[in-house]
Amino acid sequence: VPSGIRATIRAALRAESETHQLRSQLEQQLPQLQLKLLLPESEPVAALMAFITGYVESVPSCLRLVTAVSKRLGFFDYAAPFLHLAEDYFLQPPDVLPPNGGLAGLLDKAFLAHRLLEEVNDHHIKHLQQPLLPLDMTEANIIVHHLLGDAFATRLEQLVGFTAAQLLHREHVWEQVRALPGTREAAIPVVSSEHLTEPAQKIRLRLAS
């Protein structure tokens, strides 16, 4: 994982600690967010900030994990374009992203990276019947979808879907991967994205009645 990603994350967290820009936005959005998310009654904005920090900081670890697993199972050449693209979301963001900096801008990029990895993970399950990542980011990604706002998040989803479709056509690679001994190893236990936050500060989706 390029050191530039970690440096970008550190800089954004440092800027947020000085400006509180994202915290102020969340305070304004709180009434709308509470319609979609189950937040702790005590300090809900602090819980959201902890969740966002964990979500953003988990990107380098996820990229590193996909790199290691794909190399071990012999399909790194297949995964590499996705990994490079996820890195580029941080280092060379696409034009669809607004030029806002700080932690708010980084959340946009982290959402793109995590959603792209989710697409790769789904494809891995389809072909090998086990997940690539030991962390299920599905719920976390839906939560961030709500934090970004439906209209903007949907545009980012469409970008990821279009990009993934361009890269997921090389099905012949999976025939080779399925024949590798490593693909028959016991699957790594999958933990849910709620582990991104402290147990006392869980953010959950509010299910429609």
Please give the residue ranges for each predicted region:
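Terminal, membrane-proximal amphipathic helices
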Residues: 1-82, 118, 122-209
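Membrane-inserting effector segments that mediate pore formation, membrane fusion
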Residues: 81, 85-113
